[in-house]
């Protein structure tokens, strides 16, 4: 009987985009903006992924599938988000579960960023580049994804309903221009400026 051999990945190994950031992006940013101190160079701090399931009030099963899908995509257990106040028009009670969220940091963040840029974004229908107008003025970038099926971890045959998500890239950049250059250097496929 043949023995299984597993190749273990060292726990101290860096993610591909983390290595890219340390070796190339920091140099490009310091040359462009003239940073004197390494600690002033903007970095990606966290990625927050949020799925809002408004129909969870009438169909609680949809929230369960959204939680499972978000766990598959990120490799981390999602936090359930509850409504803060009751809204009768939406048949929503205070404290009712209406969504889920995951916050990724460090290695998991860079691995998700790698999968997002390399695998998921090219699978977006009619993709012509990400808009550069979604910066918030403080160096953070948020994108709305309409379909969770762009991620290869999701099996299209097993999902009951296509739902979207909001992905926020939080950086330590002070301005939107710094954040734009940081994300573009990391490989974020923005629309070409004329």
UniProtKB/Swiss-Prot annotation:
Superkingdom: Bacteria
Record carries keyword Membrane: no
Any single Pfam family the record assigns to this protein: Ribosomal_L5_C
Keywords tagged on the record: Ribonucleoprotein, Ribosomal protein, RNA-binding, rRNA-binding, tRNA-binding
One annotated GO biological process: translation
UniProt xrefs under InterPro entries: Ribosomal_uL5, Ribosomal_uL5_bac-type, Ribosomal_uL5_C, Ribosomal_uL5_dom_sf, Ribosomal_uL5_N
GO molecular function, one term: rRNA binding
GO CC annotation terms, alphabetical: ribonucleoprotein complex; ribosome
Keyword RNA-binding appears in the UniProt entry: yes
Subunit-level organization: Part of the 50S ribosomal subunit; part of the 5S rRNA/L5/L18/L25 subcomplex. Contacts the 5S rRNA and the P site tRNA. Forms a bridge to the 30S subunit in the 70S ribosome.
Job description of the protein: This is one of the proteins that bind and probably mediate the attachment of the 5S RNA into the large ribosomal subunit, where it forms part of the central protuberance. In the 70S ribosome it contacts protein S13 of the 30S subunit (bridge B1b), connecting the 2 subunits; this bridge is implicated in subunit movement. Contacts the P site tRNA; the 5S rRNA and some of its associated proteins might help stabilize positioning of ribosome-bound tRNAs.
Family statement: Belongs to the universal ribosomal protein uL5 family.
Protein name: Large ribosomal subunit protein uL5
Species name: Chlorobium luteolum (strain DSM 273 / BCRC 81028 / 2530)
